[in-house]
Amino acid sequence: MATFTPLNAASEDLDKEKRTLEIRIEEAVQIYQNALSAQKQGDDNAATKYYDELLNVRILRELPFTVNSNYKKNNALLLLHYLTRKNHGLFLLSKLQSLLSLDPSTDPIPVYRDALLDFAIALACDYNDIELWSFVAELAEKLEMPRIQRFALESSFYTGYEPFDAERVFTNIDDLNPGKLISLQNLYNLLKKLGGIAEPLPQLDLSISSLYTLPSFFPQLPTPSFHRRSINLCPKIKKLQLSHDTLHGFLDLVLYALQINEKKTPTRGFPSTLIIHVHSLNLSTAESHDLESTDSELWSEISDAGPDTNTINTAAKLSEPVYAKDIVPPPSDNLPKPQLLKRPIDDSDVRISKRSRGRDLRTPSESNLFSLIASITSDINEQIQKRFPDATSPFSGESMFREYSSIFEDYHQLLVNFPSEGSIPDLDVSTDSAANGAFSKMILIDLAMHSANRLEHMQVPDGYLLQLLSEVNSLNMVPAELATFFVESMLRPRKLEPPFYLQQCWGKIFKKKFTTICERIESTLHELVKASLQTPEVFNISQSLFELFLDDYFLALKFSSNDQKDDNVSEIPTESLEYKKLRCLRWKSLTEQVVELQPSCKSSSQRHLIIRNSWARNLLLRLTGCSSEAIVENFKQLRCLLQENSDSLELLNSQCMADLSVQVVDFELSKLQTVEFFNTLFMNTKNLDFNAVIKNLEPVLSPENKFAEDPQAKFISQFLEKTSTEFQIHLWYLLYQAYSSAHRPYNSLLCAFQSLKIILIRLCSSSFSIQDAGRRQAELLGMLNFSSNLFRIIWQKLHEQPDILSPCNEMTVIDCIRIILIYLRTFAIYVGIDEDISDQRIPKPSNPEFDSYAQTVKDSLMSGWCIFYTLFAHLLHYDFIKADAQKLLPQILTAIHSQYSFRGYCSSSNQSFLELSQTECQRLDAWENENEILQCVCCRFNLIIGSEYYVPQSHQSDSVNLTSNDAIKIIPFILGFAVKRSHGWVMPRSDQKNALEIICKVIRFPGENNADVYFNKCAIKEFLERDISPQLTKMLLKSNDILGLREIGSKVVDDRVRGLYYAQSQVLFGYYRSRLKGSRCINDLLVIIKYFLLDLYLNPRRQDSWYTCSSVFSSLADEELGWSAEQICLADDVINEYRRKAILCNLMALSLPFTQDKLFKANVYFDFAMNLYASARPPLEMAAFLPSETRVFSGASGLYNLSMKPIEVSKVIALAADYFGMSAELSNDWRALYMLGKACRKCGDMENALVHFEAAAALAPTKSGSGSQQALLIEPHYALLSNLSKAAIEGSVEIVQILSYLRRIRHPPKDSGSLLEVKNEDVNIYKRNALLFILKALAEMRILDKQSWHHRPTYRIAKIMEHLGNVQQAKEEMETLFSYKTSGKSLLNIWRTPNERPGRHFYYGATYSRYLLSLFYKTNDKVNFLQFLKRFRRSSSTIYEHRQIWLDIMIKYLEDLRLQHSVKETQINDLPLVEFKYVYKEISLLDEQKLSLLHQVYEIRKLNNGLYPTIKVDDFLIDCFMSLYNEVKSSISPLDANIPNSPSTITAKPLNDEKAINNENSVKQKTVITRKDVVSKVLALFRPHRETYYRETQNKILQKLASTSSSLVRSFTEDSSQAGESPGIHEEIQ
């Protein structure tokens, strides 16, 4: 056997993989050949063995046609599968034949199934093997699998891609070859056995047929006997359950059964073997059959595609009943009820209960809105009655609605008992029925009749459904028989009762489904009627079916002529209009045959049937276009027939022939005389000749026209008075469209109002009131639907054209208001019903269409109130009305809004009322109507913006996204009340901030493409990138326009948008100052900067924007400075950039002319001076003034760059002092005087500084802050005392003057007046007394500071004590500012004071630390010094320039150790390893006193932790170790230690011998020790395991370590004394 490479070999070559598959196929073929040889030789055992081995081969275990197959494209593999499976199946059958000859009791079924499986796999590989299909058919016949047998026989006719065509096979038998005739005979026998062939096959020549009769392939194989009945005697019984026990449920079940039958029945229309049994949970049948569905293999259950939209889902298990319902399953009592939103408390009282800033309180809302409006308009009502005494005023209250109480009662009952789904026959006709303005002949035929709308009424006698179910189950009907039985039961008379068709009123859905069933079994019904023409009941059935089909054809014609679609057309299979027409003609001829066979002596029921038939035939003639003469003749005959017996019929379920009476016939005859007029109208509308349409309709519709001269118009007008209301509305709508297209809006508006008036006249007519309740309520529902559409049309006109009412007179407006109020009063009934439903006092209607209808009513309510307001506002313009519109109109709007402030009523009708109310309130008086505007904005856009008097409430309205146009409209209002500015400070409200953020996002920047805006943008950006130079500062302070910024006019930017970005930035900045300050919200401040820059691009000369922008940049710098000391060092460039831009914005604000008051000017001066002073002082002193520009100069050696000269700090502080002084002159504020004194002190002018400090202390309040944040204000008082102590120590001011200042301080110490007495003593005594007085005053001030916030007095007390020689007390005072002795992590024990500049806190920490170190030296406090260092090392976040201070400590510390112990610098020169080991061992045995120096360096190395360069510490550590090393080595005898004399035993080699050099280096590395090894060995001496050895001597080591600190402290002191009292250590830093 050939060898092969497996697939998991190392190589990944595709050719090798392909070769591997070929080898496997070759091996399998070899096994297949061996199996065939064994089978040929008759060795069944060997063949079985080979076949088992073959089928277990890897490539044959996976079927080649599966999705996951890797070899499905290999033809050789497919052939191998095909041959193996086919021959294996034949081998199994052959082996079974041998076994049966030996043992006849062998069960053949398993072998048949295995062989059938093999044949199936073989056919999947090659489906063109006709012989193999015949094998499958014969095996399926033996197994009694008719479905498989039939499929195999049909497949033997057409293989490959040709589908089986039964019609072609059974009609073209002569074209079949002999091999297919046997299959045809077998298929015929099978279908005949199943009852699926209605007609026999065409006659064949039996002799020829016998020649082609082939014998059986397996004649000796037996057919097993199954223990079940024959298949043709065992149909499948389907048990279905009613969804609910009504005719609706039975109808759904019948329709569902037909759909199941259509899916299960083959395409040739073979009879169904599916028997339907109906079951109901609530109805107990007399003969209850607990039948199980048999497993039939002929038909499948349900198609895998699932049921369509008209079917229901069947249950998977037979034990579960099947609901035959195409809408929803039956409701369960345990289902949770939907939670409805209840109406909240009316918020009108809330709105009017707020303080109204002196405004009149609005009238509170009442329960009855119409009574409230009547009370508001009582004066207007009197004026109308006085002007028009005979007219009915629309504002007379409830008295106007009394005559319409019956309408209100009918509508209330209709809503309480809302019709179920589809229970109204037809409400599809609306004002939109004139599609494209065309007048259709179907509109004339349909709408000229009175409305046939009725509510569904389908009650059945008790026990009828139970009897119906029992009869159905006893007859064992198939779906078609069940459908026929149900149709007959609905159309056949019941003993002495008329049929349900005439007795019940069917809803639209029921009628459509019933018509669908009739269409599906029409041929059966036709044959049934045709077979029993003389039966009395057949006339009822045939005539009713004729009327149903005629009604269906009529509705189809109507919808096709109007280009409309019915809502439920998609649920029923549609047919062409021509087929519907032919069907009606077919049933017309059939009913004529029935009429001819009726007896001459006719009963009343037969006479009524003949009348119905005559009317239907006449209507069909009209629909098919018959001549008018024949139609008139038929109507005359029908009139005589009706007059003979005074008959009058009413067909409850017919749309096209609802009422049959003499009056209707007369009306139809008169209608035929108007055909010419309406044909002309039809052609004009079709040609879109609107002027001609107006000319046609104006004379017959307008009531003010005279008809004496035009008899045709008079006749048409009289005819229209007899027509239905729907038809009249249709004509008015045509006239409305014509007026609109002819650009006559006022006339079109009057047409819409006239339609509303016509509907109202119809609802108040006697003919409407005498109808039965069901028909009256159905028509009322349709009329109100008309009015809803008209409301939408009218409001659209009024909204789009505000001046459309200008030509309208007073009476027309009053009449329109009255009509609108009546409709609103009708629709308001729904509000009460909705209240009851939400409060669960009444149940919600089960009709799913109720929600959509409810939304329609809500839309009608709000659009109707918009129409009423518009008409009422126009009425106030007339001269005879004397009323204050600005006060009256907002009351109307507020009353309406408060009445509908629940469950989203106010947002209905596409938020038309909210938009109207908001717009009108802004137009009338935005300030007075602020609350209503806020509520409208909240309901429309979900923007909750509260004022100081009112916060809007949620009305559960559906909000919309805010658009740019909407935002622009509300910008002036929001900016008018929300932005209350006071020199940069804005009332911070989060809701206003969020609202303005949304508005700014919606409105795009208006000047993106304008050249002037772009110029301003570039100029401002370039200006903010400049350095601060003396020239620039001088030019800006002289108010020179150096930027040349351009003004942006109103043509480029809308004035309403111009202040938006300014207002938003002010609100955001105010929000930051009140809530976010100190939280390092950099991103929020950058957003504020963005809005300020956008405002400056549009308004470059707005001084307040430049000034506040400077404050924002300063806040950015403050946030970075106040976070941590480390952040100051990391973000120094960013902080300097913020400070530089803040100063530039200040300069730009100063360059613009001041237009505001002195206080604003003083604030600008003060902030500018503060920015200068803060930038010139630590931390980051003068960094903002460093120039980044360079100049290029030409020298002897070429061009070179020279940096610009920086500004001197003295000039910056002097400029700040000038502006502090100007701010103090304008505002007389203590802060300006306080900062002026500090600036003068830094400039060296102590005398003026003391003057300003004293003035600031006199003006300063006792406490700062407000509320619980109040704290004692001591800054100006401390500054005065501190500078007096400095002046006394320095001698810059005479002592007498100092004493004079001290006598005038606000908080003098107790019992210290003697210290200030002048007794001609020594000046030094006066100086000492002054310092003692200041000490006591500072101590008294510190006692007043109960919160211990202020730390500066403690520092100043320590400085004075040191000067007086009491260093120990000075140190104790300073130690209170630190917490290094406790176990906490923080070093500083000071707090940020309210008036402390950001960043100064960390600078004070550095100053205090340096000063405390010097005091430790002076007091020789070594232990506290070491503890302080340990805590100081971990305090980098609170100490400014922490690293630099630590470096200074380490440098002095190591130098002091080197000098104290005389440690020399040494170099390690290849110490021998043997020698080092011996000496190191001796060193490790030394006592702690000799190792104390190394231990001190080890401790400081651990404490340093890399902050100071570790290599320098290690160098000093090595120096200390080598000093000890040499000392120990010198005390050891070389002979005792066996130490070699030479440091290395490696002999020298020539330089050119590279191998020798490498050997020497390797040996050297093994015999010498390096510097790194020395450090590691020294550190090993003091590892944690040796800590127990030194625990007893720890105090001694600490003392030695502290003794070395004296040089360090001394160095600090010496540096300070040499440089004078430097500001970095000894001077107070403000």
From Swiss-Prot:
Keywords: Chromosome partition, Nucleus, Repeat, TPR repeat, Transcription, Transcription regulation. Its main location: nucleus. The keyword Nucleus applies. TPR repeats lie at residues 8-42, 1230-1263. One of its GO terms (biological process) is chromosome segregation. SMART domains: TPR. It is found in: Nucleus. Interacts with hip1 and slm9. This is Histone transcription regulator 3 homolog. It comes from Schizosaccharomyces pombe (strain 972 / ATCC 24843) (Fission yeast). The lineage of its organism: Eukaryota, Fungi, Dikarya, Ascomycota, Taphrinomycotina.
